[in-house]
């Protein structure tokens, strides 16, 4: 009897967990991650601005032109030496905006943090802005010892 109850609990837990994967927020996150990965590739010299800018807000489409992209690439190359291995480490959700924070490796700095801010209108997410800053990521050690 205990095994049946345990099995039933496990099945229901997995079923409830899968509901989160089908939420509308996951569609927005997929859009945002697609845009961020395309922007990252663009900064690394891969892709075309015209294709990537479809996920931008109208203001960013106007201001982030080829000259601004070249300036950003130059700044990344000079200050960071290039970026790689970016991983999403934080997602902040607000009423009408999302902020995605990525941490990755840089050649001339210990690490780089990229922050992307999206405005959310219904089921559409538009990139409002982004920034890159060099950061130092410190590993936190767990000093707790097992107590007998």
What kind of feature is each model-predicted range?
Residues 93-148:
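Exposed beta-sheet edge and beta->alpha loop/turn motif
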Residues 1-5:
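Positively charged n-region of N-terminal signal peptides that target proteins for export
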Residues 43-51:
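Short helix-adjacent coil turns
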Residues 18-42:
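Short, low-complexity N-terminal intrinsically disordered segments enriched in polar/charged residues
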Residues 50-95:
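Short solvent-exposed beta->alpha transition segments
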Residues 8-17:
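Bacterial N-terminal signal peptides
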């Amino acid at each position: 009897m205990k095994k049946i109850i345990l099995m039933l609990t496990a099945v229901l837990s997995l079923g409830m967990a899968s509901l989160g994967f089908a939420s509308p927020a996951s569609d927005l996150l997929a859009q945002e991650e697609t845009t961020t990965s395309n922007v990252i590739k663009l900064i690394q010299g891969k892709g075309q601005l015209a294709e990537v800018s479809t996920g931008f807000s109208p203001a960013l489409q106007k201001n982030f032109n080829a000259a601004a992209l070249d300036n950003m690439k130059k700044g990344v190359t000079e200050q960071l030496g290039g970026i790689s291995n970016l991983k999403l480490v934080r997602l902040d959700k607000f009423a009408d905006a999302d902020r995605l924070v990525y941490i990755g490796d840089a050649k001339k700095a210990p690490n780089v943090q990229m922050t992307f801010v999206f405005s959310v209108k219904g089921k559409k997410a538009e990139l409002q802005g982004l920034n890159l800053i060099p950061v130092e990521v410190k590993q936190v050690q767990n000093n707790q010892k097992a107590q007998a």
